[in-house]
Amino acid sequence: MGMGMEKGMTAYEAARERTVEENKRKMEALNLRHLSAAIAVAPKTPSPMKQKRRRIIEAAVVAPSPPRRSRRLANLPEVKYAEVAPDGAERMKRSPRKAIDSIYLATRGSISMEARLEAARKAEELESQLDPEFPSFVKPMLHSHVVRGFWLGLPRHFCETYLPKHDAIVTLLDEKDEQFDTNYLAYKNGLSGGWAGFALDHGLLDGDATVFQLVKPTTFKVHIIRATVDDGNEVTK
């Protein structure tokens, strides 16, 4: 830089220009100026690590790995959630009560209120002829007693007066004196296990009437009055 140029500059500009010239001489001495130019024009090549990572990501998108499962479930068959409409047989398995109802109605026929009342009237007449020494009551049969559930509730006042205050085995005697043991549940005032066997074995149907006569502390003699269907024929076993 000549002295004439420095005379036309301020002190700050002159000092800055001298610093720039000094830096240029240092870069030329170390050959850094040509190296920086070569770097500027060199083509950019992608990093091999970035390429590898991109390939891994793309492969994961195309072929996803199976979901992780615990060791306890690893050997179990895969659960499929496809909804398939059940066929008729499967629907029958899921709703056995409807099938039982259909069979029952087909074999029983329809029962009118008059037939129910007539069976109950005959049962009351029979009860009036029994030995009053042994307490008794009339129990008309309902659908829940002989088809669904097979739970037979007994009159509460009778249970509180004559039956045990705790659960017990109550024996039922039919007209042939055959014995059937049932489970008496004191807190529910009714017969559970064993009653179904008695009802099915004797062909009890909705609308029939029964007379329970307590001949021993935990033994009933059971008399059965059959109801009649609408065609006037009495239903038998």
UniProtKB/Swiss-Prot annotation:
<dbReference type="InterPro" id="IPR044837">
    <property type="entry name" value="REM16-like"/>
</dbReference>
<dbReference type="GO" id="GO:0003677">
    <property type="term" value="F:DNA binding"/>
</dbReference>
<dbReference type="Pfam" id="PF02362">
    <property type="entry name" value="B3"/>
</dbReference>
<dbReference type="InterPro" id="IPR015300">
    <property type="entry name" value="DNA-bd_pseudobarrel_sf"/>
</dbReference>
<protein>
    <recommendedName>
        <fullName>B3 domain-containing protein Os03g0184500</fullName>
    </recommendedName>
</protein>
<feature type="DNA-binding region" description="TF-B3">
    <location>
        <begin position="137"/>
        <end position="228"/>
    </location>
</feature>
<keyword id="KW-0804">Transcription</keyword>
<dbReference type="InterPro" id="IPR003340">
    <property type="entry name" value="B3_DNA-bd"/>
</dbReference>
<keyword id="KW-0805">Transcription regulation</keyword>
<dbReference type="GO" id="GO:0005634">
    <property type="term" value="C:nucleus"/>
</dbReference>
<keyword id="KW-0238">DNA-binding</keyword>
<keyword id="KW-0539">Nucleus</keyword>
